[in-house]
Amino acid sequence: MSFDLATCRQSALQLLSRRDHSEYELHQKLALKGHPTEVIDEVVKYVLELGYLSDARYAASQARQIVHKGYGEQRLRQQLKEKRVAEEVIEQALAEQTIDWFELAKEVAHKKFKSGISHERSQYAKQVRYLQYRGFNFEQIRYALQASESDE
């Protein structure tokens, strides 16, 4: 297959017109379409120069989505690392979030466990695992479960 620079640019612009992507993610998607690595590198550089591609903007967008879906800080970090976003960019995206992760964990626990926090060991462990899976750390989980218990 013979792909030229214009075709690769067009593919990149179509992808970026739908939503933000990380540099790595855009590179992978263009490679899946069969574009040569040299051409992809040139196109990524081109869209970066135009400001169409930004890991910082992508990280901020992902952070808003994660918070809106009720996931925690750990989950956000994990997802951004999977997309090969730089650690500094992740830290910046987290710093821009004005969310109280403790209160978010409490809201998620309250929404999921309407019947209240269980004092039975196996059920309590299940609730802790659920909040861990959602990306909350142990301090946030402890706060959420204790706060939910005192709300009852």
UniProtKB/Swiss-Prot annotation:
Its main location: cytoplasm. One of its GO terms (biological process) is regulation of DNA repair. Keywords: Cytoplasm. GO terms for cellular component: cytoplasm. It is found in: Cytoplasm. Gene3D superfamilies: Winged helix-like DNA-binding domain superfamily/Winged helix DNA-binding domain. It holds the Pfam family RecX_HTH2. The keyword Cytoplasm applies. Modulates RecA activity. HAMAP family: RecX. Belongs to the RecX family. This is Regulatory protein RecX. It comes from Vibrio cholerae serotype O1 (strain ATCC 39541 / Classical Ogawa 395 / O395).
